[in-house]
């Protein structure tokens, strides 16, 4: 709501500023309708529909508030949304070991969504926080195409991910003086595989 006053003007101005596309990600079924509405508002907006691992414990997320933690039922209910032509990806999905989200539950959820992306031939928008080993295990198994946002892994892992066809997203923190690891990663991958994130 804090952006409501000038949102329309800002969104309309994006192409003039050189923006060629925007991918808005849902984090649970409760976000999906809003994300689809935005995706239908202009040809350069696209939707990603998925269940974020943190939605497994967020009380206001539909995963908890509506489905009482039954992500399988929620994912089944979301399935018809993927027929919408504005849906360009499955996301935001992934693993997050920073928060107290049951690890096996989020692993199973992520794997189910990777299977869905493969079945629908859609790319993925992936979240990976402090879960690199398990993340790479599933990426090796399913070999999705898409983007790993807010990349924080090593240069070697980045090279492997790019070889698999993934894009790597980097936020403003890469400009910090102490961001030496990010600088090494950016030097190790083709620039066209790096995405800037807000």
Task: Kindly give the residue locations of the regions a language model identified.
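Mid-domain alpha/beta scaffold segments of enzyme catalytic cores
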Residues: 1-198
């Amino acid at each position: 709501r804090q952006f409501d006053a000038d949102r329309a003007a800002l969104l309309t101005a994006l192409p003039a500023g050189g923006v060629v596309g925007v991918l808005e990600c849902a984090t649970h079924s409760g976000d999906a309708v809003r994300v689809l509405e935005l995706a239908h508002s202009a040809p350069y907006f696209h939707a990603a529909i998925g269940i974020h691992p943190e939605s497994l414990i967020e009380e206001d997320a539909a995963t908890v508030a509506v489905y009482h933690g039954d992500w399988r039922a929620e994912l089944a209910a979301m399935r018809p949304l993927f027929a919408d032509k504005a849906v360009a990806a499955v996301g935001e999905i992934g693993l997050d070991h920073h928060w107290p989200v049951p690890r096996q539950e989020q692993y199973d959820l992520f794997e189910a969504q990777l299977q869905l992306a493969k079945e629908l031939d859609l790319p993925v928008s992936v979240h990976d926080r402090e879960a690199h080993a398990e993340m790479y295990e599933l990426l090796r198994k399913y070999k999705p195409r898409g983007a790993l946002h807010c990349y924080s892994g090593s240069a070697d892992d980045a090279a492997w991910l790019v070889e698999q066809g993934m894009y790597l997203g980097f936020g403003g923190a890469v400009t910090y003086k102490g961001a030496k690891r990010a600088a090494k990663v950016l030097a190790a991958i083709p620039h066209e595989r790096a995405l800037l994130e807000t």
